[in-house]
């Protein structure tokens, strides 16, 4: 019998509770149809609150503290990328290629690319960007100068740097033309991801990794400067703005669902669907000021680390909804087990998530707020979910950010036994 194809679909930044499958407001009928052929997991936890370490964990089966490729006070993006380029941890792609699989990776997130070391083990790897500017020298200058394009232009003008202004203006115009033609930021490359998948899958069995970027910021008609002001304590973001952003997030999820439906239709048309292990999940979620924080990274609140997980097993496994806990870290072992004909379950007794600080430098225009960033964000945090409880610990401060039973906050004094047990669980994460 032909080995099953393996397909991993990462819906970048898609939090669990936004999806109608889990009781959320985003109508995603394509995902609902897929779920009817699949096992829907209720408690999947991302191992990290942002893209890079979460994907490394997905590909290696190791938590961030185990693979070591994560942020810290000293390690920002250049150091993190370098660590991934030097990593020798075996990846899913390497494992499957050694077993005769054609390995294909397609990403709409520039962070997941050949340049950042995520192509290891892949025969083919394609990364889509709507903007060549992001990869240009002027992009580096832009990030160093300010939080958004308007700021960059103003600062260059003030400096009287005519050459840079002209170059920036041309690149800016190119971006705007391309963005308008593709309906960006609603569409962030999902159509291209699907088109590339159809073109790049040429032989069986195959491993196909897809990263869809639609749910990730930016969102339509909103300046990131307002978010940066909020994150650095300059000016809190207003409720109306937060509500607007969340409504755009829902629209992004609903558009993504259309493209997921097209992917599934293509797999069925090519008779690839039935004999495929298809794992759909997200690398992290997205916060909308539920705990005073916007977007993702840094914190381990549910809106950031609870993610969807829907798995279709090859040649049928009865559709079901499964409790317990699941982690992206378990995907590698699940693939090994499916290929070996063993236990087809990803559920575990405990799931963890980790954060080690702030991953990126804030723009130079916020250098007067570095004290605020360091005070609030340069901290180690770790969380564990087990037995219906969650302990979310600020390690640097030596205190709990959260202690929950279900979704309800409870006191450590009234749940001493459980608090002690979860504290011991967290000791395994160094």
Over which residues does each language-model region extend?
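Catalytic domains that recognize anionic headgroups
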Residues: 1-430
């Amino acid at each position: 019998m032909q080995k099953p194809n393996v397909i991993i679909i990462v819906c970048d930044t898609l939090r669990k509770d936004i999806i109608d499958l889990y009781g959320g407001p985003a109508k995603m009928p394509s995902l609902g149809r897929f779920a009817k052929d699949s096992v829907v997991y209720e408690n999947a936890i991302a191992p990290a609150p942002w893209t890079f370490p979460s994907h490394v964990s997905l590909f290696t089966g190791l938590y961030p503290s185990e693979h070591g490729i994560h942020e810290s006070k000293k390690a920002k993006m250049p150091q993190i990328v370098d660590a991934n380029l030097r990593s020798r941890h075996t990846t899913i792609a390497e494992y499957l290629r050694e077993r005769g699989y054609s390995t294909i990776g397609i990403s709409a997130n520039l962070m997941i690319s050949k340049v950042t070391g995520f192509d290891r083990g892949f025969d083919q790897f394609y990364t889509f960007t709507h903007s060549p500017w992001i990869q240009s020298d002027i992009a580096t200058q832009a990030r160093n100068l300010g939080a958004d394009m308007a700021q960059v232009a103003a600062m260059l003008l003030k400096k009287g740097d005519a050459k840079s202004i002209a170059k920036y203006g041309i690149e800016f115009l190119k971006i705007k033309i391309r963005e308008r033609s593709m309906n960006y930021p609603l569409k962030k490359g999902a159509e291209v991801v699907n088109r590339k998948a159809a073109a790049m899958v040429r032989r069986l069995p195959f491993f196909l990794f897809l990263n869809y970027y639609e749910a990730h910021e930016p969102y339509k008609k909103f300046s990131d400067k307002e978010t940066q002001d909020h994150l650095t304590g300059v000016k809190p973001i207003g409720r109306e703005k937060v509500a607007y952003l969340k409504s755009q997030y829902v629209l992004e999820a609903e558009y993504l669902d259309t493209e997921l439906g097209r992917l599934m239709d293509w797999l069925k048309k090519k008779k690839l669907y039935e004999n495929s292990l298809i794992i759909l999940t997200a690398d992290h979620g997205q916060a909308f000021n539920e705990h005073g924080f916007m977007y993702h990274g840094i914190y381990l609140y549910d809106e950031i680390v609870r993610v969807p997980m829907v798995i279709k097993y090859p040649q049928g496994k009865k559709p079901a909804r499964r409790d317990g806990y699941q982690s992206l870290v378990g995907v590698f072992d699940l693939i090994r087990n499916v290929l070996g004909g063993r236990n087809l379950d990803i559920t575990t007794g405990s799931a963890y998530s980790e954060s080690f600080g702030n991953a990126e430098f804030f723009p130079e225009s916020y250098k007067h707020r570095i004290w605020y960033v360091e005070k609030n964000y340069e901290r180690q945090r770790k969380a564990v979910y087990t037995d219906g409880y969650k302990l979310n610990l600020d390690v640097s401060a030596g205190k709990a950010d959260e202690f929950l039973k279900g979704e309800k906050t409870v006191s450590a004094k009234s749940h001493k036994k459980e608090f002690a047990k979860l504290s011991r669980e967290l000791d395994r994460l160094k």
